[in-house]
C-alpha cells in the first residue's frame, strides 16, 4: 500500500468479503448505493484558489457627468511559494485590515482603553449609519474611525485614502476633546457639591516614583557601606591608618633616649 491508505475506497469490497465469509449475517443497506456512487479515487491535491481584494469606489469617469460606482481589483504580487506552503488555506483579507493597522500604528494608546467584549455576529458595524462618526449606543473607539473612513471611500466621489483618513481623524479628535471637557466639567461640578475623588493618576504615579527612589537610595547606601568594608579589609580602616602615620611622625621628631 505504500504511503497511501485505500481502506476507505475499498469499503464495499471489504463488506462483500465479510458477508461471504459469514462474519456479518446480512449485507449492509448502503452496499448497492456505494456500488452506484463509488467514492472518488483522485489522489491529486488541488491548490487552493487565490482570491483578490475587491474595493468599491465612487469615481467620475471620463465622458460621464455623474459619479459611478466602480469596483477595483487590487493587483496581487506573484511570488514563488515553497512546496511546504503551496497547499495552505488562502489568507482572508479585508480592506478594513489595512485601515485598522494604519490607525492603531498612529494611535497605539487607543488599544489601552477599556473595551466591552460582547459576543455577536461580528456584523455590528452594518447596523450603524457611518455617514457620521458618533453612533447612538456605541462607544467611540478606533473601530469607529475605521468604519467612518471606509464609508467615505465607498460613498464620496473621488475620495482618496489619505483624505478620508484625515477627515475621520479630525472628527475623532473633536469628539475626544468634547468627551474630555464633559468629564472635566462633571468632576468640577461634583467637587463643588462636596464630592472627593482622592489623588489623581498623576499624583499616584509621583508617589510610586518617590517610593521607588527612596528604596533605591537605601539600597545604594548599603552597597556603598559594603564596598567601604571590602576596601578596609585590604587596606585597613582610614582612622587606624591616620593614627599610625601620626605615631611615625612623632617618633621621627622626638629623639629616643639611649
From Swiss-Prot:
Keyword Ribonucleoprotein recorded = yes
- Could you give a GO molecular-function term held by this entry? structural constituent of ribosome
Q: Any idea where this protein resides?
A: Mitochondrion
* Pfam entry (one): MRP-S25
GO CC term, one of those recorded: mitochondrial small ribosomal subunit
Q: What is its main location?
A: mitochondrion
- Keywords of this entry: Mitochondrion, Ribonucleoprotein, Ribosomal protein
Tell me the subunit arrangement.
Component of the mitochondrial small ribosomal subunit.
Family per record: Belongs to the mitochondrion-specific ribosomal protein mS23 family.
Spell out the protein name for this chain: Small ribosomal subunit protein mS23
Question: Lineage from the top down?
Answer: Eukaryota, Fungi, Dikarya, Ascomycota, Pezizomycotina
Query: Gene for this protein?
Result: rsm25
Amino acid at each position: 500500500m505504500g504511503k497511501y491508505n485505500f481502506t476507505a475506497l475499498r469499503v464495499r469490497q471489504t463488506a462483500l468479503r465479510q458477508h461471504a465469509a459469514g462474519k456479518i449475517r446480512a449485507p449492509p443497506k448502503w452496499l448497492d448505493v456505494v456500488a452506484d456512487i463509488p467514492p472518488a479515487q483522485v489522489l491529486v491535491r488541488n491548490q487552493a484558489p487565490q482570491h483578490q481584494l475587491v474595493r468599491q469606489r465612487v469615481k467620475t469617469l471620463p465622458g460621464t457627468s455623474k459619479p459611478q460606482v466602480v469596483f477595483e481589483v487590487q493587483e496581487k504580487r506573484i511570488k514563488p511559494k515553497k512546496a511546504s506552503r503551496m497547499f495552505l488555506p488562502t489568507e482572508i483579507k479585508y480592506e478594513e485590515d489595512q485601515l485598522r493597522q494604519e490607525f492603531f500604528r498612529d494611535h497605539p494608546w487607543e488599544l489601552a482603553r477599556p473595551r466591552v467584549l460582547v459576543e455577536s455576529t461580528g456584523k455590528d458595524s452594518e447596523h450603524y449609519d457611518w455617514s457620521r462618526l458618533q453612533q447612538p449606543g456605541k462607544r467611540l473607539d478606533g473601530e469607529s474611525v475605521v468604519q467612518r473612513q471606509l464609508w467615505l471611500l465607498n460613498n464620496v466621489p473621488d475620495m482618496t485614502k489619505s483624505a478620508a483618513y484625515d477627515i475621520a481623524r479630525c472628527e475623532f479628535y473633536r469628539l475626544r476633546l468634547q468627551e474630555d471637557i464633559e468629564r472635566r466639567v462633571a468632576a468640577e461640578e461634583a467637587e463643588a457639591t462636596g464630592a472627593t475623588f482622592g489623588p489623581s493618576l498623576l499624583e499616584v504615579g509621583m508617589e510610586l516614583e518617590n517610593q521607588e527612589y527612596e528604596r533605591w537610595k537605601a539600597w545604594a547606601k548599603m552597597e556603598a557601606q559594603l564596598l567601604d568594608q571590602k576596601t578596609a579589609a585590604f587596606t585597613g580602616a582610614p582612622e587606624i591608618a591616620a593614627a599610625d602615620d601620626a605615631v611615625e611622625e612623632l617618633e621621627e621628631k622626638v629623639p629616643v633616649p639611649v
